[in-house]
Amino acid sequence: MSKSLSFKTYSAKPGEVERSWYVIDADGQVLGRMAAEIARVLRGKHKPQFTPHIDTGDFIVVTNAAKIGLSGKKTEQKSYFSHSNYPGGVKFDHVKDLLKKKPEKIIEHAVWGMLPHNNLGRQLFKKLKVYAGPEHPHASQNPVEMKVN
């Protein structure tokens, strides 16, 4: 007789997921390509234990968010729309203003759009840490440097 094979699909359990810490330097990186890779790692799709309904992803620390690269004329032309739900409450935030005031928000907005918009997505988003400068307070977690192509 041959060995018996198990044809059961593996499903990760929340307690048995091992999480790693990665650090990404955003200096000169293209926003969309970097955000797609960050969303993939936050979701856990780079692991063989990926389970769609369980948080199997890792932590990501992004540094130098103020030096992010945008292709084309997006620095001058791109803007983010929001509304307060009050009459006349339309607000546009332009990218060149956000790069000066809150450069972290640009990366966070791009990654948030690539994550699921449900409870799992909110849980995944909490594992993203973005900092405008090169320093971050997560050195004690020993993050591994991650290259984004």
UniProtKB/Swiss-Prot annotation:
Coiled coil, from the record: none
Superkingdom of this protein's organism: Bacteria
GO CC terms in record: cytosolic large ribosomal subunit
GO terms (BP aspect): negative regulation of translation; translation
Gene3D superfamilies listed in its UniProt record: Ribosomal protein L13
InterPro entries: Ribosomal_uL13 (IPR005822), Ribosomal_uL13_bac-type (IPR005823), Ribosomal_uL13_sf (IPR036899)
Entry's transmembrane regions: none
GO function terms (MF aspect): mRNA binding; structural constituent of ribosome
UniProt KW keywords: Ribonucleoprotein, Ribosomal protein
Ribosomal protein among keywords: yes
Subunit structure: Part of the 50S ribosomal subunit.
HAMAP family: Ribosomal_uL13
Family, as annotated: Belongs to the universal ribosomal protein uL13 family.
Protein role: This protein is one of the early assembly proteins of the 50S ribosomal subunit, although it is not seen to bind rRNA by itself. It is important during the early stages of 50S assembly.
Annotated protein name in UniProt: Large ribosomal subunit protein uL13
Species name: Chlorobium phaeobacteroides (strain DSM 266 / SMG 266 / 2430)
Lineage, opening ranks: Bacteria, Pseudomonadati, Chlorobiota, Chlorobiia, Chlorobiales
